[in-house]
Curated annotation (Swiss-Prot):
One of its GO terms (biological process) is translational termination. This is Ribosome-recycling factor. The gene is frr. It comes from Mesoplasma florum (strain ATCC 33453 / NBRC 100688 / NCTC 11704 / L1). Keywords: Cytoplasm, Protein biosynthesis. One of its GO terms (cellular component) is cytoplasm. InterPro entries: Ribosome_recyc_fac, Ribosome_recyc_fac_dom, RRF_sf. One of its GO terms (molecular function) is ribosomal large subunit binding. Belongs to the RRF family. It is found in: Cytoplasm.
Length: 181
């Protein structure tokens, strides 16, 4: 019984952490190295995250500087950023790749919030699926009485509500960050 709750709680916590990591990559109009976490470069034939092949710094609030450890990767980094859905325009020279982060228009901000809320719903569905699977597991276990199953359902629902509330709170903070000028 406790095992079912512990597994559900861990899976829900993992989902909340995954959401936190996911929204770090959403552009806010300020330069952030985490923006490039999902950008992959072809490093000797292997897709590798940019942050594992280069030093990424933010010398100014609207500027990202990427300094690949292997200078031959500069064009690969530029190509990978151009292919990404970040809508950034990298400029390269012999040593580094510079990316000026343009200020977000209100229309783009609203679109980003809309996109974030759509993705948020997918994470909420994950939480609900964990709830459903955990309750099904408890019901299928013949060694657990009906009263105990009802108690497990109540506890799992509390975990579900708490996890969804956390997702919403994280999203509200990001939305404020996105809508701030």
């Amino acid at each position: 019984m406790d095992e079912i709750l512990l597994i559900a709680e861990q899976q829900m916590e993992d989902t909340v952490v995954a959401w936190q990591e996911h929204i770090k990559t959403i552009r806010t109009g300020r330069a952030s190295a985490t923006m490039l976490d999902k950008v992959m470069v072809n490093y000797y034939g292997t897709p590798t995250p940019v942050n594992q092949t280069a030093q990424i710094s933010t010398p100014e609030p609207q500027l990202l500087v990427i300094k690949p450890w292997d200078k031959t990767l500069i064009q690969e980094v530029v190509a990978a950023i151009n292919k990404s859905d970040l809508n950034l325009n990298p400029v390269s020279d012999a040593e580094v790749v510079r990316i000026n982060i343009p200020a977000l228009t209100e229309e783009i901000r609203k679109d980003l919030v809309k996109k974030m809320n759509k993705e948020l719903e997918n994470f909420k569905v994950r939480i609900r699926n964990i709830r459903r699977d955990s309750i099904d597991t408890a019901k299928k276990d013949k060694s657990i009485s009906e009263d105990v199953v009802k108690g497990i359902e109540t506890d799992i629902q509390k975990l579900t509500d708490s996890s969804i509330k956390q997702l919403d709170e994280i999203s509200k903070v990001k939305e404020k960050e996105l809508m701030a000028i």
